[in-house]
Amino acid sequence: MKVAKEEIFGPVLCAIDFENEDEALQIANDTNYGLNAMIWSNDLNKVHKLAKRIKSGKVLVNNLSDGDMSLPHGGFKQSGFGRDKSLEALGQYTQSKLTLIEIK
């Protein structure tokens, strides 16, 4: 399904039926992009296992929250948009320097 493989920025939800977790992971990871993923489940054990295996910069579980810039965020694969929208990403544009001076 082409819509599931595109990186779409807009009010689009792509919901696909699947038979088991392995098929769900295959569908989720069968794309050139990996900015966001969503899991809707009441089984937190499954959620943790799936979230580890999904190739995405952000995995939302049972919510639509975008988080805030204090949370790390970056896309996987060819996803680039959004990588610079966190405090963690600011480190790519800065260089830290420490100067220690002993004053007697």
Where do the PLM segments sit?
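Conserved C-terminal structural/oligomerization subdomain of aldehyde/semialdehyde dehydrogenase
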Residues: M1-K104
